[in-house]
């Protein structure tokens, strides 16, 4: 399989701890994930969480470890470019799926997580790569935010509720 990322993208990721990659997933993968999330909302796992603070406002939902519960997610894990992209970013020969996690945050939702490092959720040492894949166009103020270079600070920000 040929390389997906170029050297400049990998350097930017190493420097900033995050990178905005466009056009790396065929639209069929995006559509497949939409179908999977719709199924998962109807038939959630025991780990499903509704983070919506005000039920009168648009929702903010989450579930994890669902990759093997819905065929769309299973296909994505095994056949999409996800693992290849992560291995190229980390310059690793082998990638392990530690966790899958989906969030459904409707436009206009006032519910959102505080700033945190994702690695604080996991009991392991080493490098990790999180891919945030929006399934529809997102305005900057509704998207995810990173602090460039914060992965190099040797300081961990834990999520609080």
Model-derived segments and their meaning:
Residues 1-16, 21-115, 121-122:
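Non-heme Fe(II)-dependent double-stranded beta-helix
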Residues 109-161:
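Catalytic core of non-heme Fe(II) oxygenases with the double-stranded beta-helix
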